[in-house]
Amino acid sequence: MINQNEYQRDYVRVLIIRADIDKNGLAYSKAAEINDLIECFRLLKNGFLAYSTLGELLKTFSKYTNGNEDLSQKMKRLRNKLDFMNHLRNKCTGHLDDILIDKAIQWEPSLFTKQVVESEHHIYLIYKTLLESAINSYMDENGGQKYFHMEIDLFYPPNWNDFINFMAESQVDSMDFLDDLLSEIKKNLRLIDDCDDLFLQAAIASKTDFRLPKKGR
């Protein structure tokens, strides 16, 4: 049995993730359209975080799929995309680890040519190469790229289109899933609809203790 606290928490989670995916998607798509690729790569890095968060919450949200085959199938279709997004977030946004950077430098030796280092476009090439390295390091058990099934070079237009299409499909599928999930939650969400109830909740609010428990204690 799902209680009101769970419904409220999940409602907040869904609204935040949905808004982030929507606004980030519009922003990096617009940047790509006007060929502002530095801004596009920067926004993509931010965009991975919302998808990664959604992936981490699928287990929490799975309780809403019981008896709802359509929502269950939408969640299943998202899993592979969100697993890939989580990898990109970890490698390209959350952790700038030594191994990935070393792979990026090996993959793009021109990063440290004098001409490139002194160019105003140096950061663009760094963003691009780190993203490629993160994409290509998402491997299956045979050492092949796990999602695209080929090595990706974002300077190669078909590869760039494949990646942008992946991001667009991920946005559409995620928004569709989140909209359906939101509808399920709202059916059971008890809203404050009279002054007496509001005053009661305000009294409870005045007793809020903002100290958070320490982990491991």
Regions picked out by a protein language model, each given a short descriptive name:
Residues 87-90, 94:
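Long, charged low-complexity segments
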Residues 1-84, 99-102, 108-111, 117-217:
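Amphipathic alpha-helical interface segments
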